[in-house]
């Protein structure tokens, strides 16, 4: 098995990816990892939201929306989408893509951190999305309360976060024993490696306190990151994606995806 470099966990701090915008575009969004993520999120949203693509009056908020891949997809379905991100560079790329697609009239772009959502007075939304953001924040628990406050009583929260248990398991599979023994911590920050993976037990406690119930749990990249032959993801991607989508909502696979995607409903 090829030994892979572990993904480090630096000292806690919120993260702005402005300086890594093009690296994100090439190393995440344009890769098999990005394709799996996009396919999983689209499938899950359609499975849980019967109005998707039909009720064009529905409002969507994408927090930490980055370059706007999913936001553009939802705007193309006819929905009004507000994208919030802390990075000017990310938002500019999203604006360019929205303009090229003729979607600017249905999209709004705001530069702000998640922590300032309440101050923006945007009202509540039928769908709030926050994908791959929490693991970069210091105060993850408070972020969940802020997100829930933006969800309408009949709305939903789509939350995706970096899975601590899967991160540990993957590094054991890769043979990074020292890294695991050190508690998945390194001294130096790694560019695209999340700062704070989230434990499933912690997330469960936070959701209970926030009065959010899980309507659907999905693992994202349940198999991709554990492949012994790294070239298989490229050589037979369609088969890999089909199997990811087939099993990633079933346990135990749903709990070993590198990311966990939750569709959450507020308890009113």
PLM feature segments, named:
Residues 2-55, 57-64, 69, 73, 101, 156-183:
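Conserved class I S-adenosyl-L-methionine
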Residues 216-268:
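A C-terminal cap/extension of S-adenosyl-L-methionine-dependent methyltransferases
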Residues 194-211, 217:
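Short alpha-helix
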Residues 129:
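A conserved beta-strand element that flanks and buttresses the S-adenosyl-L-methionine
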Residues 69-116:
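Class I SAM-dependent methyltransferase SAM/SAH-binding core
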């Amino acid at each position: 098995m090829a030994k892979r470099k572990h993904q480090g966990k630096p000292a806690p701090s919120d993260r702005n990816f402005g300086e890594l915008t093009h690296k994100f575009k090439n190393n995440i969004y344009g890769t098999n990892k990005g394709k799996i993520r996009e396919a999983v999120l689209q499938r899950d949203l359609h499975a849980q939201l019967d109005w998707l693509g039909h009720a064009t009056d529905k409002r969507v908020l994408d927090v930490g929306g980055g370059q706007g891949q999913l936001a553009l997809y939802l705007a193309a379905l006819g929905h009004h989408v507000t994208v919030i991100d802390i990075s000017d560079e990310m938002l500019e790329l999203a604006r360019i893509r929205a303009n090229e697609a003729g979607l600017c009239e249905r999209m709004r772009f705001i530069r702000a951190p998640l922590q300032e959502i309440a101050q923006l007075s945007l009202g509540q939304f039928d769908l709030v999305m926050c994908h791959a953001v929490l693991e970069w924040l210091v105060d993850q628990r408070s972020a969940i309360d802020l997100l829930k406050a933006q969800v309408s009583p009949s709305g939903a929260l789509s939350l995706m976060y970096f899975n601590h248990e899967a991160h540990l398991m993957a590094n054991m599979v890769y043979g990074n024993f020292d890294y695991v023994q050190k508690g998945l911590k390194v001294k130096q920050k790694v560019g695209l490696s999340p700062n704070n993976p989230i434990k499933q037990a912690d997330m469960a406690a936070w959701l209970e306190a926030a009065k959010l119930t899980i309507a659907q749990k999905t693992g994202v990249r349940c198999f991709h990151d554990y492949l012994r032959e790294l070239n298989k993801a490229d050589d037979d991607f369609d088969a890999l994606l089909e199997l990811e989508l087939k099993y990633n909502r079933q346990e135990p696979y749903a709990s070993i995806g590198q990311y966990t995607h939750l569709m959450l409903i507020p308890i009113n």
